[in-house]
Amino acid sequence: MSADIRFDSLKTIVPAVSRETADRLIAFEDLFRKWSKAINLASPSTLADLWNRHILDSAQLFPLAKEATRWLDIGSGGGFPGIVTACFLAERSGGCIDLVESAGKKAAFLRTAAGHLHVPARVHSARIESMWEKIETPQVVTARALASLGDLFTLAEPWLSDGAKALFQKGRDYQREIDESRVGWSFDLVKHPSAIDQASVILEISNLRRKTD
């Protein structure tokens, strides 16, 4: 797939994207493929369609909170959506994203990617719970393929209960997760259909509160 084709496909997701951002994302794809030969950054079965399955899928989050400058990605793994978001924030004055990843090798990759791409990302090689008091409440919290919705609420509660909103990417079982999480939590919800996978959604969560008996 040529750079021009990648750029055109990216514009279908983020119409106002610049060529500079597209070039960063293409460079990230190349770096990701190189590191994937040494460490497991993503399921090998998805690498053949890395641009669509991971990069475009992650890129669709940014337009949902494009005015936000302070982001947090938990369980960042191989950089989806964290590094992808950082590529967009690179052209935003004052923009920054914190990436939290407990696996040391993946955190090392994230640091390498952030430096190589010159994007505003701070990488924390730590468990999410250990960062509750260390990372200031962002405007947006993201997570992808990390945990059930209820568990995500527990992990992100200190930030979401302090005014941050969440953009959580979920697959075909999303409605069951929503129903189960409402047992212990109250929250406002907007469901955005995925532009990449018809069975998936992006859950926009705000005003999270833990229910009390």
Curated annotation (Swiss-Prot):
HAMAP family: 16SrRNA_methyltr_G (MF_00074). The keyword S-adenosyl-L-methionine applies. One of its GO terms (cellular component) is cytosol. Belongs to the methyltransferase superfamily. RNA methyltransferase RsmG family. It comes from the Bacteria. It catalyses: guanosine(527) in 16S rRNA + S-adenosyl-L-methionine = N(7)-methylguanosine(527) in 16S rRNA + S-adenosyl-L-homocysteine. Specifically methylates the N7 position of guanine in position 527 of 16S rRNA. Its main location: cytoplasm. GO terms for molecular function: rRNA (guanine-N7-)-methyltransferase activity. It is found in: Cytoplasm. S-adenosyl-L-methionine binds at residues 75, 80, 128-129, 144. Its EC number is 2.1.1.170. Keywords: Cytoplasm, Methyltransferase, rRNA processing, S-adenosyl-L-methionine, Transferase. InterPro entries: rRNA_ssu_MeTfrase_G, SAM-dependent_MTases_sf. This is Ribosomal RNA small subunit methyltransferase G.
